[in-house]
């Protein structure tokens, strides 16, 4: 099936589409299912009486909440619906073919076994696997000293060895948004994030509202989380696939996954064309009469923040990477391990990609310095004394200044499109790029992808222009000025008249009568995505306005702070147009402004710059308009609506305005909700990865419902978490998650500078999508948050996020290596230092006095002076000043010379 045919099928059946409401119909009625209630110290659970699969899993502390879809148990009662307690097996005899068995496909009566002692329920479920199963499968629910455990014993009942090449345990949790309001979803549904870390792997199940308790699914011995396989919807799966579920998957329901213990047989078949798996696929063999027991344990953490402490309390190995698991080759990283078993060895896969050097321990944690070579994915495999192995997944990148340069060069050359005969006004343009085809995408039936608007079409030029905020390049700036003047103004954006400043949905559209012969006849142009010229010209989608506002605002900042770079217009023109875009949004696209918008933080910066420039009338009007939105959100319990049924893109802007207007309780709720879908996990792919699973439909080449790794939500949701950390530097977890998301957005950039929309995490893909798509929304988030952080943690000691740290003679210094080198937070001082011109080479902090010395790069043609702003962000922090420095527009203007210069900041 081609990508476009698959796209047609998916877009026709997806539950929620941009701008569309969920289709609702009368609910059918179902017969109730008999259940057996069970109590353990931590849970109130229920098993289906007929199958002994899990029908309810409520924490004892809150019995009205259910981690599994118990409310839908009756409608999910038939054959083909998987539950916790089911099993998937693929086996073969020596030299034979693989055969699949699934306990949920055609259920048969189970044979109950005696439940004595700590056993809560037991059954032989072999009959549900079918008559040809070479294995006897017994399942037991156990109360193991107060911990709920699920165990399967597999016994080879034949006279020949049996190889188990695939073994999966369905993990069915209530992540379903369908037919629920936002309030109901936040109260009733949960998210699941995996740590695919072999013997140290686990699942964390967190409630949408961010409150505790959280659920952890932990492996028993011999039950590694080797892979995390999506259980596909039966109606759409390949013929013969029985490892499926009949529940619909779509934007309102991600679906369920297998805890995959063995995956070799999948790797040989379904995953044969995929990229490298998280772990080497394995199988195991049972001799005649031999048995093996596998199992998982269910425990609760009192809060999401207490997950790591709960892992330690349950004798699980815990890894903490600083600053995370994305390691540029010029940065030092650290790995802290707290483990019940001594470390036997640490290996790099591939060999030499990572080195982990033991350092002095940190209050019960083993510490390693981690350095990287090369580029791309790598793993540290940590073997413990008992033979168990923990996998920590890393991503190695170029030094970030090189990555920034690569992105700017690629987007303004390989993605640059000029054609005076282009019938859609895309001349010049920066268009979506197809990495597989090696060319820009001039037509796609999802017309916005080729139309420079919507996220899927604006992403590439937004990335190119956002890169200039801290790393302006004269050649790139010259092209971007043309892009704004010749294409954005007048084509994408209405230039004058009653709708001046309004933004169209797409420049590209479908009109075969007007453009005969233009459209690819092999593509289906009959779905709703192939907008007419009228629909493409609609001004009512507010989500498109921040993209254009970013373009104007960045060029304002460059023109204001880097003399001679921007020549098309004075700085005031760009700031005026950023303001005009904002007010046009409120006038021409008011409906969606009731929601937080992706990249909506740009409006806060525009307002602040209007104030700094003394443009009082404009600032007053913009503040009035934004306060209307904020006051509306303040009345809602969960003000995170979207054009989707649930989304992770509106929260950052909601948080920003709550903070701006002093609505701290609402800001706190927003932060808590973000932490429900934005985890810290020892994997570059999941650490700081804001949950998203549907946007490949709208911005990717391969349109699938699939967990996306480092879609633009990762970096955008890092923005509020960074702010929250700077307000409370005692909460290291906030910084770890934020930095994971911010750096996650760099992994999308390949060695040439191409930037992918997101990584396909499903094991049959495991590679970056070939379309650049909506990546630029995330790169904007990286551009405004790129910074270095210096802190002294009570457990881990002095740490640097984004920079290398040295200590000497009572002083601590950090050499920033982040992608901007224009922002620095000194946590012990609570001081946030930002530069709008110039670069920070080094900062030295003297804890005894609080003095901070900045070493600034020498002058360049575009940076003859540095523009330095300082802000104390904590309640206990003291204000800082730079004596003798000239103050201009709220910051210090510091002349730069031919050699690096120093600026001393002192607390008052």
Predicted regions and their residues:
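Bacterial N-terminal signal peptides
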Residues: 6-15
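Beta-strand-rich N-terminal accessory domains
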Residues: 22-250, 254-256, 265, 272-276, ...
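Short, hydrophobic/aromatic beta-strand segments
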Residues: 158-168, 306-309, 344-347, 865-868
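Low-complexity, Pro/Ser/Thr- and charge-rich linker/hinge segments at domain boundaries
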Residues: 177-181, 309-330, 390-432
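Aromatic/hydrophobic beta-strand junction motif of beta-rich domains
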Residues: 327-342, 856-858
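Extended acidic/polar, glycine-enriched regions
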Residues: 341-406
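Catalytic domains of carbohydrate-active enzymes that cleave complex glycans
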Residues: 422, 426-439, 444-470, 474, ...
